Amino acid sequence: MSWNHNRRWKDFQALVNAEDYFAFFELPYDPRVVNVNRLHILRKFAQYLAPLEHFQGSEEEWLEQARQALEKAYQTFLTSTPQQEKLFRVFQDYGCPDPVGGCAGCSSSGERGECSPGIPA
């Protein structure tokens, strides 16, 4: 492990926001990425933590797995968007009504096929 070995489960449980998690795990991050994607990063982090619910290793091993999960969640949003990940209901039905030709939302966002719901084609 390359981070502080004195971290404990009880300290992890007291964490509140994304920045707290990054500080706890001593992971570098771009504040601009976290500011824009914080809820998505935390949701993805929670998804990666779910399989650890019945983890049988030591506390230190669990925390290392959690550290890797946060890093992986953060890395996801360096190359992907909330619309592509569809972690929240608002994005689950997200998509262009005309993915071939695009619509007003596509042309205004500059991302053909990834427009805002409710914008007429």
UniProtKB/Swiss-Prot annotation:
<keyword id="KW-0535">Nitrogen fixation</keyword>
<comment type="subunit">
    <text>Homotrimer; associates with NifD.</text>
</comment>
<dbReference type="GO" id="GO:0009399">
    <property type="term" value="P:nitrogen fixation"/>
</dbReference>
<comment type="similarity">
    <text>Belongs to the NifW family.</text>
</comment>
<protein>
    <recommendedName>
        <fullName>Nitrogenase-stabilizing/protective protein NifW</fullName>
    </recommendedName>
</protein>
<dbReference type="InterPro" id="IPR004893">
    <property type="entry name" value="NifW"/>
</dbReference>
<dbReference type="Pfam" id="PF03206">
    <property type="entry name" value="NifW"/>
</dbReference>
<comment type="function">
    <text>May protect the nitrogenase Fe-Mo protein from oxidative damage.</text>
</comment>
